[in-house]
Amino acid sequence: MASKSTSTAVWGQLRHLAQQQTRCYSATADSIPASKKKYVPTKGVYPKGFRVSGTIVGVKPGNTTKPDLAFVTSDTPCAAAAVFTKNRFQAAPVTFSRDLLKKKGNSGVNGVIINSGCANAVTGKGGLEDAESMAREADRCLGGDGTIVMSTGVIGQRLPIKRILDNVPAAHSRLGSSHDHWLSCATAICTTDTFPKLMSRSFTLPSSPSVEYRIAGMTKGAGMIHPNMATLLGVIATDAPIAPAVLPSLLKNAVDRSFNSITIDGDTSTNDTVALLANGAAGGKEIASESSPDFAAFRDVLNVFSEDLAKLIVRDGEGATKFVTIRVVESDSEETAKKVASTIARSPLVKTALYGKDANWGRILCATGYALISEPGSAAVAEVSDKIVPEKTNVSFVPTDGTAELKLLVDGEPEQVDEVRAAEILKAEDLEILVRLGTGKAEGTYWTCDFSHEYVTINGDYRT
């Protein structure tokens, strides 16, 4: 057994390694770990009519070098939709922004203002007044009355509101549409993220094949990520013309297949918000009907785009060393498949085994077995007996190099596992866990990461 002094020394080394990962607020370009730089774009194609900025305010005490106030604006009022956390303790900006969109009927929105470093959550009436004052100052600068507000950071502390309000005009003066502007804005919403999460791409629509439309998005999140949703902020902007009436269904459909299909640690935040803005600046026929070919085409674009954005969050999970796809197939329903995938994805025993490169498929099977049981008792077990049948269940590791899957369990019977090959698969940064339930044709997917020593260190030091 290790001595106390030895254990202390080991823990000190782990703390030092975690600090080297630069899990600070709003990672700057020169602090991004080498392994993550490949996920940060060096150029982009950004939607017309949008201007953005990132400004250093010092929301978190001691921050004098990293942007922590993001401003996303449209030159013309937008159609807008948002989805919000389902946590009962909803932060002040969530309450404010939900009410704003309801009042304005998802139209007439000028932009989004976001601070990192303080969540403005569980802050009472004063916190709501702070969110309202952020919107008012942004509106004053923009000459409108429709700014969405988002905040992220430590819960239970009031915003340094005067400092923020004094800097909104500066954020407005810095607005621009270049790649550097977008990257600075994406950096400003980060907390314990190690890299800014920014994407953009172009697309066409059936009714206007000669028109190039563009979509750009930024998101943040590294911990407390679990639907619906979690400390996760996202802003997606497009210059496609989309009617306010159909925008909410487009966003909800995309979020269900992306941001609501990821988990880092199983915790759901008070603040998560994803907003979609459409200003129509590229021209063309407005998407006004859910039955139109343009609606279906944009839905597909948005679904893939949102999924790719969400995956960046998992790749930056606190302490994560692996990106893991959990795919459940041959299920009786999509609901069952998603529930099983979600349960496996958030199991601490599964996640720690993955970090340790341990082919412990018993933990995967265990999580599968209790996934649908909401309460103990024989009645609960009987209720799900036709949805998860041990004799029909198969579990495999699927490598990302295109080689054959490694079967661990076949029709409820354990395979003789090639431990050497299993170790090779588990050494990779990316891998897939495949579960076949054998009860139907539906499937569901979740994305998650492993748990490492660094996760404990980061969250033990979060407020310091």
UniProtKB/Swiss-Prot annotation:
The alpha and beta chains are autoproteolytically processed from a single precursor protein within the mitochondrion. It comes from the Eukaryota. GO terms for cellular component: mitochondrial matrix. The record marks T152, G153 as: Involved in the stabilization of negative charge on the oxyanion by the formation of the oxyanion hole. The keyword Amino-acid biosynthesis applies. Substrate binds at T191, K220, T231, E318, N459, T464. It is found in: Mitochondrion matrix. Keywords: Acyltransferase, Amino-acid biosynthesis, Arginine biosynthesis, Autocatalytic cleavage, Mitochondrion, Multifunctional enzyme, Transferase. Its EC number is 2.3.1.35, 2.3.1.1. The active site is at T231 (nucleophile). Belongs to the ArgJ family. Catalyzes two activities which are involved in the cyclic version of arginine biosynthesis: the synthesis of acetylglutamate from glutamate and acetyl-CoA, and of ornithine by transacetylation between acetylornithine and glutamate. This is Arginine biosynthesis bifunctional protein ArgJ, mitochondrial.
